[in-house]
Design a protein with these regions (language model features):
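Acidic catalytic/metal-coordinating carboxylates
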Residues: 41-44, 67-70, 91
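The feature encodes the CheY-like receiver
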Residues: 19, 64
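Acidic, metal-coordinating helix/loop segments flanking the phosphotransfer/catalytic sites
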Residues: 38-56
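Short, flexible helix-to-coil linker/hinge segments that flank and couple to helix-turn-helix
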Residues: 94-159, 201, 212
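Helix-turn-helix DNA-binding segment
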Residues: 141, 147-182
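Active-site residues of response regulator receiver
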Residues: 60, 88
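Recognition helix of helix-turn-helix DNA-binding domains
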Residues: 169-202
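Short amphipathic alpha-helix used as the core "switch/output" element in two-component signaling
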Residues: 47, 69-81
Length: 213
């Protein structure tokens, strides 16, 4: 229950229906949780937030088109008291830092134990900040100056570089992110410039040295 003695209303935002269903079941095992809406993209997430006014919105970062971080920024712009928990596969400090800068109250990596999702939702609903241990460690390392040259990349550039390093073609990346292959190619060129790479192969080698895999 929240401070008012009623169930914590949760909005789930992830572009994979099966994943949302799993989170839905996990959260509603707790009688103090009620999933009031689900969304698969930024536009629907913002509309659901407006209609249902959840206590906590749980957002994935890698949404098609507009990212979860930009979605969080827009939610907070529309509703200043929005409480957002980012729930993402990305454990890097840069993602967490930019999520908090966008207005998120918590950041949980999908590598975390399932029970941490319930704990994180409760914490954010109470108005406190939550960071999963692995992400907290990455943030501490970043604060100590260990984030490296990769910090110059935008969130979208990080996503694209990870997918390139995993062997995806430009068209495949575009399909996953909801953008054209040309847009991905433009991002690739910008990434090469920032990392000092002169070819696609060199870019992959540099990325792996930076820990992308």
């Amino acid at each position: 229950m929240n401070a008012r003695g009623r169930a914590i209303k949760v909005l789930l935002v992830d572009d994979h229906a099966v994943v949302r269903q799993g989170y839905h079941r996990l959260l509603e095992r707790d009688p103090a949780m009620q999933v009031v809406a689900e969304a698969a993209n930024s536009r629907d997430a913002i509309e659901c937030d407006r209609l249902f006014r959840p206590d906590v919105a749980v957002l994935d970062i890698a949404l098609p088109g507009v990212s979860g971080i930009e979605t969080a920024r827009r939610m907070v712009a529309h509703r200043a008291d929005a409480r957002i928990l980012m729930f993402s596969m990305y454990q890097d400090a840069i993602y967490a830092s930019r999520a908090f800068a966008a207005g998120a109250r918590g950041y949980l990596s999908k590598a975390s134990a399932p029970e941490l999702l319930v704990q994180a939702v409760r914490t954010v609903a109470d108005g406190r900040r939550f960071v999963s241990p692995d992400v907290a460690e990455a943030l501490a390392a970043s604060a100590a100056g260990a984030s490296g040259v990769g910090a110059s990349l935008s969130v979208r550039e990080h996503e694209i570089l990870r997918l390139l390093t995993s062997g995806y073609e430009l068209g495949e990346i575009g399909e996953r992110l909801g953008v054209s292959a040309k847009t991905v190619a433009n991002h690739q060129s910008a990434i090469k410039h920032k990392l000092g790479a002169t070819s696609a192969l060199q870019l992959i080698l540099v990325a792996r040295q930076l820990g992308f895999n």
